[in-house]
Amino acid sequence: MVNPQKINHFGKLEMAFEPRRGYTRLVHVYQQPPLKASRELYEGSDPTATVFLMESSGGMVAGDRNEINVKLASGSRVRLKQQSALKIYPSHTGDHCTQAITVEMADEARLEWLPEVTIPFERAKFQADTTIRMKESSTLIWGEIVAPGREMRGEVFDYQAYQSKYKVYVEEQLIAFDSIHFKPQEMNFAALGLLEKALYIGSLWIVSPLVKNLNMRDLQDLIQQEQSLQASVTKLTDQAIHCRWLAKEQRTLHKEINRMFEQMTALL
């Protein structure tokens, strides 16, 4: 159990990747607890560097802050995986805990951020800010899932506040801005146009020069294979699409968003 009286953490993780001798290498890393990155892992001759992101404190509490900065040099291929769900503990002081992620991608770089779950506990307050800056020739596949709380313990939208901002810039032009601001005590999530009967939200962002070759009707059919989910695909620009799911339970959503993630990595 996290001690609510603990000293606030300021986690910091800086990573820089570049191709060397046929593989993408993690050439610079700065780690400030509780954030930590694994060494690079590879699958056979695939030059993609897979790195696991770890949070050793077991979760974030009021006043904690995590900063993650990622830089990909030209031609880098990187897959980042969170080791576990991000747990947001109750705010006993009334302060938010915050997470800021900044990514810079050079020409023909490729980043895959695999989806993991953010779980805001009862009375939690959380703010997240993610900013991606990339080139027209680079590729981004990014997934994330937001839970209503510890559902198995009966915590469903019992947190105080959840706020996230997600921005993608291509050649310094803003092509995507997604803002979520939930205050369960002030909102009726069952209302038409909000979550209605859904509990979980899943998102997948795909930005690539190859998006223009994808058929939107085929993607719509692909994303709607699981009847228990509500899902849709939106074309943002000729090189960007956004997929969103609303789900009643986590396991099916996780399975479907990962299936779509792997489909996109294969197509792009």
Swiss-Prot record:
It is found in: Cytoplasm. Pfam families: UreD. InterPro entries: UreD. One of its GO terms (cellular component) is cytoplasm. Its main location: cytoplasm. One of its GO terms (molecular function) is nickel cation binding. Signal peptide: none annotated. Keywords: Chaperone, Cytoplasm, Nickel insertion. Required for maturation of urease via the functional incorporation of the urease nickel metallocenter. HAMAP family: UreD. UreD, UreF and UreG form a complex that acts as a GTP-hydrolysis-dependent molecular chaperone, activating the urease apoprotein by helping to assemble the nickel containing metallocenter of UreC. The UreE protein probably delivers the nickel. Belongs to the UreD family. This is Urease accessory protein UreD. It comes from Lysinibacillus sphaericus (strain C3-41). The gene is ureD.
